[in-house]
């Protein structure tokens, strides 16, 4: 019996059965395009924009000007990207490009001009894969999600200190001071409205309005008579402009002396100066969008006629304004059909001051606003009560700073909210958040550096008396740019070491979005609301993929189809629907703000051949809720069922059947799957695997169309008839996480290829599809308790057949230095080294490539001069004359570290003689790469794709594994108790479908939210002759008896994760101690011990294990003398000493002494068994002298001063003496 399906082709000739509903889905875009486009923007728009902001640089006396010649920018990058990147990785360099620019120097006195092209900067250049190579390591610049510049109105916001609620508006620039207007809405009294600049003290709003030229009459005229405003006017006593300016000056510039010039420039410099206050294009767009009329006049009644320029009544008084009508009215203001009103009654002194600073003549035109008088409701219209003024800003503004009409519109909106006009904003919505991507982050760094260059240049010019001698090159120093970029890439939180375990991890790290970093949130203070999933995330940010732990909800991932528009807002695609007909010809990209009042249907809606929606009623998304509407009311439809999720989450089959918490774990763990020796694509896929493989940077695509003329393990040559193109393959390269990067050709000589076609399989790729794990036969059953608590039982077959074997590459380096005592020598003649350890060295003393080395074997032979022989000049002379024997040498060879044995695959030698750039005092550096084959073993972590993770607890012989009726032994036994409470049913469905796939010798594709339904799986059971329950009779391999009940058995896709026991296993015999506590350090990297804490001590106490406890808390912990004595006695074979006082007890003793508490120490004398009382409280067991010094540095009491207080009289204490 055959259920209806389509056969879809994926990768290189893999056909999969598709049972979904979705009719047409949008082709997945190149996932790395946003990153590349952003860097491209930086090169072609960002850099020239930065130049325009800083240049021309004019000297203080105005005699010299340096300007930038437009269009002269030239970026010079390395010719062959592959070879340049390879060299950068081997030699630890940065893959960078040079920026040349032509600057013009003009001497105003004689009009002399000098033009010169200079090398302005050398900065890291992005690779094709969207990464940067910094000092030989691949790094990624992560996009940042921050509050968008603009204006944000909020009602009833809780104050964190008190329990009061506030109304407030925040004015957020991209550069400059944040401003806030707010008042308290709780309490019995009406509160006055306040204004705040940055985090300074509150200023009455009236003071600010007065300072920019308003009078009380103008304030009432424009902003109405709300109780809060009248109370603010009543309480405000400062009348003149100067008094109000002085008040603001004292708060904002509290340490500066007040001058007349300072008062005049105060507000223009804070708000109106483009160099200090910049909204950027995004801020201006947001301001114009928020401060228009539409939101406030919708669903109100006109309180006056709206008249056109020609005195024609366009809208009559009393008209009810729908949203559609509000849009029409706004449009007429935009087109100036309805004239704007001039701002009257405002003293423009301060504003005129701004014109002097910016010399922007357009600003005189900015004295206009759009004013509409309305009644908020029908009752107020019928009573003809006083109408409310709704003031909108000039709709044609494009200034990057605030202007007067903005300020009036903001204050008007604030008071309109008290009349229930307008709506408050949600700061967590993507309407009010924007993405700062790579290009913009780099432009910000470039701007900071150019500002430093401007400052330095002005200083340089001012110190020179003869300006004619100065050249452009001598004035402009490019060091600040180099330092700024170096700083950013090496130490910024946004420049991260790339996750390179597998192609999925690499892709995810390039599409990561963080709310942390400069200008972002702080993980310690971020509230729950900020971390939560928001309705506007749909199609833009994945609701599933985020880290567990303190970064949850702060680090996110872009959804599959999301992109970023020119303002930095995330946009997502839809198909438009008109009268039930879906228009597939054009894709509409919408930002969150454009979704208001529109209804969106899912992609899985049934559609006929004429693209008409079949069902009459549909569940749709509209204004942040789900509604059931008629099909005619649908405006848009999703382009794909994967639209909501990120790449990792879209790779989980049956995601819709899993609990979100487990899906989150599944997404994160897929990124940790290590590439296996033989990759295998899943039997049950979701369809995104092909796209990941195609766009991954670890796979190669043909750069031209043509014929393959040459193929080997390291390169592929394609000829298009004009010029052969060489494609270099990556061969046995080490990734950032020490996994293997190896590309295998998938084309043969003679094949014809198209541009963009995959020509090789990289790590974790199988025939052009992502392949992170293996399809293995899994049974859900318990087995003698070995899979208790998520443990996993695996068959020895998986070890023998190298099913889960991976290759890992370790790098070991050694430096050869030149010191006063002499030079390090590379040699095969190593003193006191055994022949076995030198077995693999060549004549020069370097290990031979291909050698199998083990722990302790010598990789590079090196001898260094012994430190104590530091010869004087006379001794050197004597040695030269008499030819004394060479100075004593010691063995400092590079040996294989513990647990890092394997096959030597490469030796890289960097030498100063060959022109390599090495650090000071180093003449040569040798890197050895060792490849290790790791089979799966007990203690390794494994997982499925559904968040079902566990640790291998036992590897059973094949004959002991449970087997099916036909004798097939299962590969893995999982605990059935891991399913119900975790609610990740997807793994069970995958198991059954995997069994069907194996029986029918086919493969399935089941995209997220458009997957195979359970009814279909049941019908497929019939087709594959599988019992209806999907369960099989299973037999115990040891007893041969059948299990009591049938067991679910099928094929599941299992991954081996990077958390391997080889990297975790660790034991300490001797090792370092902490300087402060004198206890052993912790962790494998420090060769530390396992902390035996308070609860562990209780456990031993309860068994009365006194001797074990005694040595744990003394010798093995912090009894300094005891452990040294013990070590000596063990070596010399003496008697084990009795445990002494631990150091922590001494700390307690000092603490008590500092509190002047008398201590008595009773010593147990072995000879006469007498107890001796120590009269002097200072006569405690011996304490090391350095310990006292250390504690004194802590500001504790100096012990020698304590003797003065041995017989103290409480009334005559000089307490000052007790402190340092």
Curated annotation (Swiss-Prot):
UniProt GO cellular component terms: DNA-directed RNA polymerase complex
Keywords: DNA-directed RNA polymerase, Nucleotidyltransferase, Transcription, Transferase
Catalytic reaction annotation: RNA(n) + a ribonucleoside 5'-triphosphate = RNA(n+1) + diphosphate
Keyword Transferase: yes
Entries under CDD domains matching the protein: M23_peptidase (cd12797), RNA_pol_B_RPB2 (cd00653)
Matches recorded under InterPro entries: DNA-dir_RNA_pol_bsu_ext_1_sf, DNA-dir_RNA_pol_bsu_external_1, DNA-dir_RNA_pol_su2, DNA-dir_RNAP_su2_dom, DNA-dir_RNAP_su2_hyb_sf, RNA_pol_bsu_bac, RNA_pol_bsu_CS, RNA_pol_bsu_protrusion
GO MF: DNA binding; DNA-directed RNA polymerase activity; ribonucleoside binding
Alphabetical GO biological process terms: DNA-templated transcription
EC numbers on record: 2.7.7.6
Function summary: DNA-dependent RNA polymerase catalyzes the transcription of DNA into RNA using the four ribonucleoside triphosphates as substrates.
Family: Belongs to the RNA polymerase beta chain family.
Assembly and interaction partners: The RNAP catalytic core consists of 2 alpha, 1 beta, 1 beta' and 1 omega subunit. When a sigma factor is associated with the core the holoenzyme is formed, which can initiate transcription.
Stated name of the protein: DNA-directed RNA polymerase subunit beta
Organism: Mesomycoplasma hyopneumoniae (strain 7448) (Mycoplasma hyopneumoniae)
Lineage: Bacteria, Bacillati, Mycoplasmatota, Mycoplasmoidales, Metamycoplasmataceae
Gene behind the chain: rpoB
